[in-house]
Amino acid sequence: MPDFLSITLSGVPPSLTSGETSNLKWQWVDEGVLMLTPHGACSQSVVLSAGIHGNETAPIEILNQLVSDLLASQLPLAVRLLVILGNPPAIRAGERYLTADINRMFGGRYKNHSLTDEARRAEILEQKVGEFFASDPLSLRLHYDLHTAIRGSHHNRFGLLPYRTTPYCAAMLRWLKDSELDALVMHTSAGGTFAHFSSEFCQAASCTLELGKALPFGQNQLEQFRPITAGLRALVSGGQLPTRSTEAMIFYRVVKSLLKQHADFKLWVADDTVNFTRYPQGTLMIEQLNEHYCVEHEYEWILFPNPRVALGLRAGIMLVQMDENDLLQA
């Protein structure tokens, strides 16, 4: 099979939509969706996705290289694997999205949007992921959705765990640690993200990974992603990662979503504020009609501050630090 990313960017399906190598069988499932299956038995079903936001190119390049190495038999395959490039039109355009953010549409929320290509794409991805996991109901289900952040961060590599009412998968948490993430954030309410969909509707152990900053194709310094790249290669090949050698991962949970509900909304942070900036108790964070929010805990940290979002969307989230053991008792 030719280069996965090149075919996806061309907008033309490959002339051959299935095939096999000495190690695996592959199938072109849909535009930007490729399934790889090892010849032997396996106990894990893994979904790896990137490009849900089209301008977040580093994860796309990482997954494309992973697929190339698997197809060239330079890396063995030990899991059932579905690789997804989420929003091909936006990837071609180099834009975050064309009409609306797909990563707010999952869990059926695409039905609340007009019939755009991106709403249809969210529906297709839900269908393909659901079918993939359902075809092997006894396997361990994992989904990592790879992104890069719009702005800088005190933690360059961090993960976001979707809200769930049962404990998080210990094997997933161990992999996240050994892949040397700097921080992990636990959501405390349901959302429309791809990772939340696979967790809630497919019972997968899921996590959104934020890796560095969004840059155009060819400008990424992929060496800075070496730990997560090594983690992904070990995950799909059945290899073992060395025990974490960097500082311990820091854990956070969401305590407040800053929703922009009125035209007079004001987010009281500087335009150059980076993710995980800390604020002391009493600091005024937002003001709008009939609402203001001040930091309620001794310290809170802000994530994804963006006052320019449309009305009704989240302009940031506030976090507090938490103990790792709470994740296993969620």
From Swiss-Prot:
Note describing how the cofactor binds: Binds 1 zinc ion per subunit.
EC identifiers of the protein: 3.5.1.96
Annotated Zn(2+) binding sites: H53, E56, H147
Reactions this protein catalyses: N-succinyl-L-glutamate + H2O = L-glutamate + succinate
Active-site residues, as the UniProt record annotates them: E210
Keywords: Arginine metabolism, Hydrolase, Metal-binding, Zinc
Cofactor(s) in the UniProt record: Zn(2+)
Gene Ontology biological-process annotations: arginine catabolic process to glutamate; arginine catabolic process to succinate
InterPro entries reported for this sequence: AspA/AstE_fam, AstE_AspA_cat, Aste_AspA_hybrid_dom, SuccinylGlu_desuccinylase
Pathway: Amino-acid degradation; L-arginine degradation via AST pathway; L-glutamate and succinate from L-arginine: step 5/5
Domain of life of the native organism: Bacteria
GO molecular-function terms, A-Z: hydrolase activity, acting on ester bonds; succinylglutamate desuccinylase activity; zinc ion binding
NCBIfam families, per database record: arg_catab_astE, PRK05324.1
Family: Belongs to the AspA/AstE family. Succinylglutamate desuccinylase subfamily.
Function: Transforms N(2)-succinylglutamate into succinate and glutamate.
Name of the protein this chain belongs to: Succinylglutamate desuccinylase
Organism the protein comes from: Yersinia enterocolitica serotype O:8 / biotype 1B (strain NCTC 13174 / 8081)
Chain's gene name: astE
